[in-house]
Regions:
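Noncatalytic partner-interaction/assembly domains of nucleic-acid and motor enzyme complexes
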Residues: 1-82
């Protein structure tokens, strides 16, 4: 019996994260539709969880603030490091 794998596309996950970082209208479109556990790759899930929390708290989202958020959560290394 073969193992069932979840669909995965690293490039698509990275495009979503990139859009959330650079396009102001992206987070409102995905925040209520995507959950961190929908990302196959753990580092992408960690980054998205930080983005989602920051969006819900009304905080500014950019590469520096997300890096700081991941650091505050103790997840910076797991998300790809500094």
């Amino acid at each position: 019996m073969s193992e069932i794998l979840n669909p995965q596309d690293a490039e698509l996950e990275e495009v979503i994260l990139g859009a959330c970082l650079i396009e102001r209208e992206a987070m409102p479109m995905v925040a209520d539709r995507l959950r961190p556990e929908m990302f196959y790759f753990e580092k992408n899930a960690l980054i998205y969880a930080a983005l989602q929390a920051m969006y819900r708290d009304g905080r500014q989202i950019d590469i520096i603030t997300v890096k700081n958020e991941l650091g505050a959560r103790g997840k910076l290394d797991a998300a790809g490091g500094p």
